[in-house]
Amino acid sequence: MEELLRPALYAGSVVVTDRFAGASIAYQGHGRGLDLEFIDELTARVTGGLAPHLTVLMDIDPARGLERIASRGATDRLERANLAFHERVRRGFLEQASRQPDSWLVLDAERPAGELETQIWERVSSLLGERTG
């Protein structure tokens, strides 16, 4: 956080990450049942209150998502978790998105890749325009 993200942001760079605090809340809090208040407090300490301007959630029915993962071959520990775990994680992500609709973009991951790319770029372009305008 302090070595990479903050300096880049202070320098005016746009930072894109694969996962951030929302993933911890979804996976650890909702998926594994850890105390959400504790995760929120820990996240606030670790990030120093830093929050993304945009979180893109590629939403898919967990059963379908697991089918896609299995078709790729090798899986990791989280991907091998049972369907109920993935359903809880999905609910955790969707709950966060519903509480912060201005900073989340929820997309149907079953849509064609080109369509998803367009939707993401439209939202990112809008944010970049606000930043420079």
Name these PLM-found stretches.
Residues 1-74:
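ATP-dependent NMP and nucleoside kinases share a basic, alpha-helical "lid"
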Residues 63-133:
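NTP-dependent small-molecule kinase module
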